[in-house]
Regions:
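ABC family nucleotide-binding domain
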Residues: 3-194
């Protein structure tokens, strides 16, 4: 990112921001609520247009007006603080939806990948459960697994522990720490210092 500016009305949230993230890095954006962390993540994923500056991804300026955001979004996974799981779908259905519908992958291959990830995140026994049958920490780990099934190059995590009870924060942070071993690039917005 080079000299990125983003405002909402007269409130300048990002002011000439420069940020360089290398492949395989885990970067934490730490600051109080309202400091622009979530806005920055939404700009990286092209969910928010920037007012000025440049956002480069894979050697391409993706911030130029008219750039199609969909190819970028297929390469960047995002996990929101509110989980955003579909309540009428099982854990497995939630996880497999995007890879099958958006990426055109085979359902059986996606289910096998999803089961392996659920196992890795300690949730294999929850594949047939619905979101309202899970704790907040379990729902957040399902959201992380869902983002990982598209095999993103970059994973954006937006305040993923902020809505959790203190006793559940540890299990979600452990899941993030385990991503370190995969070589994935992770950008984590948080006010959590642990």
């Amino acid at each position: 990112m080079q000299k990125v500016i983003k405002s909402f009305g007269t409130n300048k949230v990002l002011d000439s921001l420069d940020l360089d993230i290398q492949k395989g890095e885990i970067v934490s954006l730490i600051g109080p609520s309202g400091s622009g962390k979530s806005t920055l993540l939404r700009c990286i994923n092209l969910l928010e247009p920037i007012d000025d500056g440049e956002i480069w991804f894979g050697g391409i300026d993706i911030s130029v007006p008219g750039y199609d955001p969909n190819p970028v979004r297929r390469r960047i996974g995002m996990v929101f603080q509110s989980y955003n799981l579909f309540p009428h779908m099982s854990v497995m259905e939630n996880i497999c939806l995007a890879p099958v519908r958006v990426l055109g992958r085979k359902a059986n291959d996606t289910k096998a990948q999803a089961l392996a990830l659920l196992e890795q995140f300690g949730l294999a026994d929850k594949a047939k459960s619905y979101p309202d049958q899970l704790s907040g920490g379990q729902q957040q780990r399902v959201a992380i697994v869902r983002a990982l099934t598209i095999e993103p190059e970059v994973l954006l995590l937006d305040e993923i522990t902020s809505a959790l009870d203190p006793e559940l924060v540890g299990e979600v942070l452990d899941a993030v720490r385990n991503l370190r071993n995969t070589g994935m690039t992770v950008v984590l917005a948080t006010h959590e210092m642990s």
